[in-house]
Amino acid sequence: MSRMTLKSSMKKRVLSLLIAVVFLSLTGVFPSGLIETKVSAAKITENYQFDSRIRLNSIGFIPNHSKKATIAANCSTFYVVKEDGTIVYTGTATSMFDNDTKETVYIADFSSVNEEGTYYLAVPGVGKSVNFKIAMNVYEDAFKTAMLGMYLLRCGTSVSATYNGIHYSHGPCHTNDAYLDYINGQHTKKDSTKGWHDAGDYNKYVVNAGITVGSMFLAWEHFKDQLEPVALEIPEKNNSIPDFLDELKYEIDWILTMQYPDGSGRVAHKVSTRNFGGFIMPENEHDERFFVPWSSAATADFVAMTAMAARIFRPYDPQYAEKCINAAKVSYEFLKNNPANVFANQSGFSTGEYATVSDADDRLWAAAEMWETLGDEEYLRDFENRAAQFSKKIEADFDWDNVANLGMFTYLLSERPGKNPALVQSIKDSLLSTADSIVRTSQNHGYGRTLGTTYYWGCNGTVVRQTMILQVANKISPNNDYVNAALDAISHVFGRNYYNRSYVTGLGINPPMNPHDRRSGADGIWEPWPGYLVGGGWPGPKDWVDIQDSYQTNEIAINWNAALIYALAGFVNYNSAQNEVLYGDVNDDGKVNSTDLTLLKRYVLKAVSTLPSSKAEKNADVNRDGRVNSSDVTILSRYLIRVIEKLPI
């Protein structure tokens, strides 16, 4: 055989082999773990019909992060398909038994698909999923809708908004808030307008405002650069304060009215009617509303909220900031002189109690925020003494009745000097251990649920609130597993769940239509008011009921919505966030660990001539002196063994 004939024969054999590989991968003969095919020319030829057993995040996914679907049907091959029918990825689903829903499910992992666009999953023998997007800004609209939900909860004023072509509005409500009968025995009134209606009812509760405001203020402090430019459709949108903070200010304005008029610093527990009202519009509720006597938990939460408001509003409105911190000081002094846990006397009221077993967590949070705002030694010692009494520093499951995590986060992330190194290490260890546990729980759950098999009234709020733990852990010890678990929590409430339904009104696939919300039940409009996370299944994953009367599973609440807002805030304007320097991430994989130290040593010793990217070069300069050398190696090694608390130095 001639040399030319031999070359021609080899070309034909290689071409035949390539054709065979493509054919076999498209038909699912090769497992996706062995061959992951990105086929730009192949088109879907079968007419796939929507099947609700293919369950995924109907809002969409962010490039370069986890993307998973759960398929509750026997299957193997799946395709990721563009809107025009082009197959961009072929994979093999892996089976697992979900101990939560007690079913065998199949996990389709298509995390390597990162091109922005609109797609669906096609599963031979099953059907296709709802369309979803992959985009850096995929959560922008969801975030704005959740914030719209907060605006529409405003009390003491009229509200008006159009969403998806439907107009939602109500007239001025509860303008007589509130009477002092239960405070001083006189039927006189003290102004307590503004604030948000709490949940499905129209009352206002300080303790639940605590976790709500705390979560949203932390969202601002953790993601300020991402949130500051976000424009919201609110009446104050053209003033000099960022819109996100304008919405919070409306709540703080009400919070400031809750101090007793006698100047003692005590804070009323709630403003409420004696009994829950009917399903009528807020402007039609005319029952008298009263200040309910003080509690130590409400007073401590007041201190924390107003202290946070003082430092956050200081750059935008110094006079308002001064008003907030002065109020906080008065109530803090009262608490210092009155250490007993005092429950509110709520006799005569059948509305939400928000009675905490202990106020230790509330007082700890108050001390943390006072110290972070003012820097006084007194507040630091108060916090550290209280924190030492908590055997577990970070709890995986927390809400209005346990706000200690909020104080721990503030202390841990504070850049103020003087912190106790041993306490810092203890909190950090607890944080990372808890975050790692949440990651494992999500990875071992058939629907990526970060709360695992735990269910109770409002548990959906906790699912998204756990993103706070994951995001703070990621700030302390960068790890893409934390980010992906946070995204799993979001995915769960937007459709990757047993029902293949979004749990947020007005968003995603087949969202709730009948929430336990008086406005939605009374306004005569078919669609519910938008932007609200409902409570979710209880007592188990199959017990959610989308009916108005099911307050146990289908109510809305400001604390759950604030948790959703925090979760989404971490991924708003995410493109700009991704461009931030992650000091110590020398291999540019989104983590800082011993692998980075090894690469940095090799680079400094010239065993390798380049780092993976220009961003990696910036990440390697951990002392920010404009050079990458042995000093950076020393600093990074000290950081990894926790001699140095944070990077850069």
Curated annotation (Swiss-Prot):
It catalyses: Endohydrolysis of (1->4)-beta-D-glucosidic linkages in cellulose, lichenin and cereal beta-D-glucans. Residues 579-649 form the Dockerin domain. It holds the Pfam family Glyco_hydro_9. Keywords: Calcium, Carbohydrate metabolism, Cellulose degradation, Glycosidase, Hydrolase, Polysaccharide degradation, Signal. The active site is at D201, H516, D546, E555. Gene3D superfamilies: 1.50.10.10, Dockerin domain (1.10.1330.10), Immunoglobulins (2.60.40.10). Its cofactor is Ca(2+). GO terms for biological process: cellulose catabolic process. Residues 1-41 form the signal peptide. GO terms for molecular function: cellulase activity. Belongs to the glycosyl hydrolase 9 (cellulase E) family. This enzyme catalyzes the endohydrolysis of 1,4-beta-glucosidic linkages in cellulose, lichenin and cereal beta-D-glucans. This is Endoglucanase D.
